[in-house]
Amino acid sequence: MSKLISEIEKIDLKLIKKNKEKIKNEIIETPVSRVLSSYLDRLLPNSEIFMKLELFQHTGTFKARGALTVANEIEKEKRKFGITAASAGNHAIAASWAAYK
């Protein structure tokens, strides 16, 4: 079993809450908004749909949480050399922001 699969299997609510606590002062608590749509009401009757408005996050996406969590796990001595992200999109923006922090 690869290390990645092994790590994924370890993810649980306690870990998520622990990491949320670690980064809470650096991340924006973004709002949640109910979606009002007659089309969706017809498509999904008796449902409520909500959006988490991550566009208000520092990087404009939810990726900031993961990038910051991982960046903070890197030893300070190694982190001073920078962070590399294999991305040209939202994750790259978040990784750059996390490295800057």
Question: What function would you assign to each model-found segment?
Answer:
Residues M1-K101:
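PLP-dependent amino-acid enzyme catalytic core
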